[in-house]
Amino acid sequence: MSRRGTAEEKTAKSDPIYRNRLVNMLVNRILKHGKKSLAYQIIYRSVKKIQQKTETNPLSVLRQAIRGVTPDIAVKARRVGGSTHQVPIEIGSTQGKALAIRWLLGASRKRPGRNMAFKLSSELVDAAKGSGDAIRKKEETHRMAEANRAFAHFR
């Protein structure tokens, strides 16, 4: 048994303008080559674009989009007796949010468009409405888990 103490789970800090943890999680995922100020610029521009498009609170649109994309269940590759099975596992809320943010950013990067702020705002608005690539990715993951339900006992 280990003598070391258990590490305390870190909580996500909130961003300086909106005081929102989700915004900060988005900033940290969009970050490339340590350019955090550029990541903040992209997020804040996309939030302004969401405000212009929907004429509602952009943070509620962001919350709704992330809630819509967050998966409840995922599949994990598990090797049993020489063959690899896709085993469905339940996902916690923190891990689900992280996956949702990753999928949203991936879908926005794939979109055709002018700049990242425009693409991200479009993807967030679509996800809040229940369409878009990120929502499709969630549904595909749920379908995979449902198809491999027979292997659930391999956890």
Swiss-Prot record:
It comes from the Eukaryota. GO terms for cellular component: chloroplast; ribosome; small ribosomal subunit. InterPro entries: Ribosomal_uS7 (IPR000235), Ribosomal_uS7_bac/org-type (IPR005717), Ribosomal_uS7_CS (IPR020606), Ribosomal_uS7_dom (IPR023798), Ribosomal_uS7_dom_sf (IPR036823). The keyword RNA-binding applies. GO terms for molecular function: mRNA binding; rRNA binding; structural constituent of ribosome. It is found in: Plastid, Chloroplast. Gene3D superfamilies: Ribosomal protein S7 domain (1.10.455.10). Keywords: Chloroplast, Plastid, Ribonucleoprotein, Ribosomal protein, RNA-binding, rRNA-binding. One of its GO terms (biological process) is ribosomal small subunit assembly. The keyword Ribonucleoprotein applies. It holds the Pfam family Ribosomal_S7. NCBIfam families: rpsG_bact. Belongs to the universal ribosomal protein uS7 family. HAMAP family: Ribosomal_uS7_B. One of the primary rRNA binding proteins, it binds directly to 16S rRNA where it nucleates assembly of the head domain of the 30S subunit. Part of the 30S ribosomal subunit. This is Small ribosomal subunit protein uS7cz/uS7cy. The lineage of its organism: Eukaryota, Viridiplantae, Streptophyta, Embryophyta, Tracheophyta. The gene is rps7-A.
